[in-house]
């Protein structure tokens, strides 16, 4: 992994917030591998969502809370056991109920022919505690 890879991965992390806040669900294909996992098992009643189509459907369930603002910060890209991992913090503001939520993403990212993609994203909410 070189500096160019790190910049591309950071751009991927930035696009995530825009994609989740946008009604344009085609952006999801620029984020996840076809068999990607969006894992919210750390949330109350959450379960993993497997595959791009299922992730799009998951986002559609959140549409009533739009507009929202997903922000990703403190992005740390590192190699561990031969895999590329990303650890970052997130801030989510939902104007509909004036709530702010904070948490962490722990990602496994892979290089595909189309660029870097998220293979597995574990979402943990830290504030408010669930």
Spans of features found by a protein language model:
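Short, low-complexity N-terminal intrinsically disordered segments enriched in polar/charged residues
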Residues: 1-26, 30-34
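Charge-dense, low-complexity intrinsically disordered segments
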Residues: 3, 46-49, 96
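A beta-strand edge to alpha-helix "cap/lid" segment located at domain peripheries
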Residues: 60-130
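Short, flexible micro-motifs
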Residues: 20-22, 54, 106
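A solvent-exposed, acidic/Ser-Thr-rich amphipathic alpha-helical stretch
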Residues: 25-89
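Alpha-helical elements of Rossmann-like donor-binding domains used by nucleotide-donor carbohydrate transfer enzymes
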Residues: 15, 54-57, 104
